[in-house]
């Protein structure tokens, strides 16, 4: 079996996690108490869904997941929510006092008291696997727990499970919408360890997803639930090939192989199509070509950065539902002929496709329409550098005045760590600039863009 363990850290990680597990349960027909009427083999079978759920002797399906937060309120919602019977109580780990939006508290003072407990639980889950494939880590880098405890856990996972791949789904601060003043500090400090300790990181950004909800689903005032349900569709499409059988299955390690040209260049953009409300879906014919095109639309990207400002290095298209390889090849051929979508000149093929016959499931009473086919795209584009340069700029404005730094130093950090992390990000921006540059120097003369 190729099991995956999901780790949800901090409020954002947990709330995205709730949406994901709700969707997985619906997709597999698992009830909120963990029973699965369709599953005839009692005890651990080697059905495809066992990559994400372990099975007890009593026929109950338990998610291979850990939820961690430094304060109890968000986890208490899981403990009392609709899916409270799904999770083993030991999988929900909460502390007493929160990280107060402070990376240093999450990483040093308060985080380190809880991290061994987390690793202990993760070890139990790992021992329960026959062939652990890797970890999916969900967190946000703007707050204190997601950034601080998140990077601490990633560092420790690298030590304990060196060869296992780690996929991060990371919520980055948005350009306009901010939830805390010290977001730029937390993000820069946290990205420093995301660079070292994740193999692929998918960037998400609330503002971009808000816009998608407003524009495509006509939700005037999207809530986090709306956002998370959209994100969960992306994550579900990525992991569908691990949980169902399909024509072209894609493994977690395959993402790495196909998307990451150099170890540091591993920050991905994601998009999903069709995002369409039920009223509209009746009147649209959502062919493979159409949904493929809309996945490449700059407005479909789930992070605020414009792929037209950069070049694609590779992209992974995961189709699900009523899709045949012939249609996919035709759609990809059309994309390649489009001048608007530019690839770097050293990567001629650039596409990895996966097809899964399980049609997309929607949450009843949710916003998305039930459709026959959908596509999720994960792409590695040099335009991701925009996200980093934006955060770096905000970081510099505060750090030149050393504003708020005493809160971090007071929790046992050294000022050198700030400049070290900042230099690391500056180097990352440079790396992106270099991979996007023409390999035959300056024959086209379009270096002015950067």
Swiss-Prot record:
<keyword id="KW-0479">Metal-binding</keyword>
<keyword id="KW-0547">Nucleotide-binding</keyword>
<protein>
    <recommendedName>
        <fullName>Tubulin alpha-4 chain</fullName>
        <ecNumber>3.6.5.-</ecNumber>
    </recommendedName>
</protein>
<keyword id="KW-0007">Acetylation</keyword>
<keyword id="KW-0460">Magnesium</keyword>
<feature type="region of interest" description="Disordered">
    <location>
        <begin position="431"/>
        <end position="450"/>
    </location>
</feature>
<feature type="modified residue" description="N6-acetyllysine">
    <location>
        <position position="40"/>
    </location>
</feature>
<comment type="subunit">
    <text>Dimer of alpha and beta chains. A typical microtubule is a hollow water-filled tube with an outer diameter of 25 nm and an inner diameter of 15 nM. Alpha-beta heterodimers associate head-to-tail to form protofilaments running lengthwise along the microtubule wall with the beta-tubulin subunit facing the microtubule plus end conferring a structural polarity. Microtubules usually have 13 protofilaments but different protofilament numbers can be found in some organisms and specialized cells.</text>
</comment>
<dbReference type="GO" id="GO:0005200">
    <property type="term" value="F:structural constituent of cytoskeleton"/>
</dbReference>
<feature type="binding site">
    <location>
        <position position="145"/>
    </location>
    <ligand>
        <name>GTP</name>
    </ligand>
</feature>
<dbReference type="Pfam" id="PF00091">
    <property type="entry name" value="Tubulin"/>
</dbReference>
<dbReference type="InterPro" id="IPR037103">
    <property type="entry name" value="Tubulin/FtsZ-like_C"/>
</dbReference>
<keyword id="KW-0378">Hydrolase</keyword>
<comment type="function">
    <text>Tubulin is the major constituent of microtubules, a cylinder consisting of laterally associated linear protofilaments composed of alpha- and beta-tubulin heterodimers. Microtubules grow by the addition of GTP-tubulin dimers to the microtubule end, where a stabilizing cap forms. Below the cap, tubulin dimers are in GDP-bound state, owing to GTPase activity of alpha-tubulin.</text>
</comment>
<dbReference type="GO" id="GO:0005737">
    <property type="term" value="C:cytoplasm"/>
</dbReference>
<dbReference type="GO" id="GO:0046872">
    <property type="term" value="F:metal ion binding"/>
</dbReference>
<feature type="binding site">
    <location>
        <position position="206"/>
    </location>
    <ligand>
        <name>GTP</name>
    </ligand>
</feature>
<feature type="site" description="Involved in polymerization">
    <location>
        <position position="450"/>
    </location>
</feature>
<dbReference type="InterPro" id="IPR003008">
    <property type="entry name" value="Tubulin_FtsZ_GTPase"/>
</dbReference>
<dbReference type="InterPro" id="IPR000217">
    <property type="entry name" value="Tubulin"/>
</dbReference>
<feature type="binding site">
    <location>
        <position position="71"/>
    </location>
    <ligand>
        <name>Mg(2+)</name>
    </ligand>
</feature>
<feature type="binding site">
    <location>
        <position position="11"/>
    </location>
    <ligand>
        <name>GTP</name>
    </ligand>
</feature>
<feature type="binding site">
    <location>
        <position position="71"/>
    </location>
    <ligand>
        <name>GTP</name>
    </ligand>
</feature>
<keyword id="KW-0963">Cytoplasm</keyword>
<keyword id="KW-0342">GTP-binding</keyword>
<comment type="similarity">
    <text>Belongs to the tubulin family.</text>
</comment>
<feature type="binding site">
    <location>
        <position position="179"/>
    </location>
    <ligand>
        <name>GTP</name>
    </ligand>
</feature>
<dbReference type="GO" id="GO:0000226">
    <property type="term" value="P:microtubule cytoskeleton organization"/>
</dbReference>
<keyword id="KW-0493">Microtubule</keyword>
<dbReference type="InterPro" id="IPR018316">
    <property type="entry name" value="Tubulin/FtsZ_2-layer-sand-dom"/>
</dbReference>
<keyword id="KW-0206">Cytoskeleton</keyword>
<dbReference type="GO" id="GO:0005525">
    <property type="term" value="F:GTP binding"/>
</dbReference>
<dbReference type="InterPro" id="IPR008280">
    <property type="entry name" value="Tub_FtsZ_C"/>
</dbReference>
<dbReference type="GO" id="GO:0000278">
    <property type="term" value="P:mitotic cell cycle"/>
</dbReference>
<feature type="active site">
    <location>
        <position position="254"/>
    </location>
</feature>
<feature type="binding site">
    <location>
        <position position="144"/>
    </location>
    <ligand>
        <name>GTP</name>
    </ligand>
</feature>
<dbReference type="GO" id="GO:0016787">
    <property type="term" value="F:hydrolase activity"/>
</dbReference>
<feature type="binding site">
    <location>
        <position position="228"/>
    </location>
    <ligand>
        <name>GTP</name>
    </ligand>
</feature>
<dbReference type="InterPro" id="IPR036525">
    <property type="entry name" value="Tubulin/FtsZ_GTPase_sf"/>
</dbReference>
<dbReference type="Pfam" id="PF03953">
    <property type="entry name" value="Tubulin_C"/>
</dbReference>
<dbReference type="GO" id="GO:0005874">
    <property type="term" value="C:microtubule"/>
</dbReference>
<dbReference type="InterPro" id="IPR002452">
    <property type="entry name" value="Alpha_tubulin"/>
</dbReference>
């Amino acid at each position: 079996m190729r099991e995956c363990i999901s780790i949800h850290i901090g409020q954002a990680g947990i709330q995205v996690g709730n949406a994901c597990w709700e969707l997985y349960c619906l997709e597999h027909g698992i009830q909120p108490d963990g029973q699965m009427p369709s599953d005839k083999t009692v005890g651990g079978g080697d059905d495809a869904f066992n990559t994400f759920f372990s099975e007890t002797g009593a026929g109950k399906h338990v998610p291979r997941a850990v939820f961690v937060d430094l304060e109890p309120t968000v986890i208490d919602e899981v403990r009392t929510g609709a899916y409270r019977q799904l999770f083993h109580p030991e999988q929900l780990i909460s502390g007493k006092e929160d990280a107060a939006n402070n990376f240093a508290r999450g990483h040093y003072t308060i985080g380190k008291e809880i991290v061994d407990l987390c690793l202990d639980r993760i070890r139990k889950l790992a021992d329960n696997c026959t062939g652990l494939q890797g970890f999916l880590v969900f967190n946000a880098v703007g707050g204190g727990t997601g950034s601080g405890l998140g990077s601490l856990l990633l560092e420790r996972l690298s030590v304990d499970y060196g060869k296992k791949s780690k996929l991060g789904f990371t919520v980055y601060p948005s350009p306009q919408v901010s939830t805390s003043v010290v977001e730029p500090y937390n993000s820069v400090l946290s990205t420093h360890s995301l660079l070292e300790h994740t193999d692929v990181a998918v960037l998400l950004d609330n503002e971009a997803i808000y816009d998608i909800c407003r524009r495509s689903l006509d939700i005037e005032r999207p809530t986090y639930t709306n956002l998370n349900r959209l994100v969960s569709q992306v994550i579900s499409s990525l992991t569908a090939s691990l949980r169902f059988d399909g024509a072209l299955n894609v493994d977690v390690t395959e993402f790495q192989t196909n998307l990451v040209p150099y170890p540091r260049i591993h920050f991905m953009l994601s998009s999903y199509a069709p995002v369409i409300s039920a009223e509209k879906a009746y009147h649209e014919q959502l062919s493979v070509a159409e949904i493929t095109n809309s996945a490449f639309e700059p407005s479909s990207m789930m992070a605020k950065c414009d792929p037209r400002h950069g070049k694609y290095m590779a992209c992974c298209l995961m189709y699900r539902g009523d899709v045949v390889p012939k249609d996919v090849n035709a759609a990809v051929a059309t994309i390649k002929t489009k001048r608007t979508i530019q690839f770097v000149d050293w990567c001629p093929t650039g596409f990895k496709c996966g097809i899964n016959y399980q049609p997309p499931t929607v949450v009843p009473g949710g916003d998305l329409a039930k459709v026959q086919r959908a596509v999720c795209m994960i792409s590695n584009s040099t335009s991701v550098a925009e996200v980093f340069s934006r955060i770096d700029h905000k970081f510099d404005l505060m750090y030149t005045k050393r504003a708020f730094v005493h809160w971090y130093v007071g929790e046992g950090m050294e000022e050198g760590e700030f400049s070290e992390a900042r230099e690391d990000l500056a180097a990352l921006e440079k790396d992106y600039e270099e991979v996007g540059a023409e390999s035959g120097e300056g024959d086209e003369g379009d270096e002015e863009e950067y």
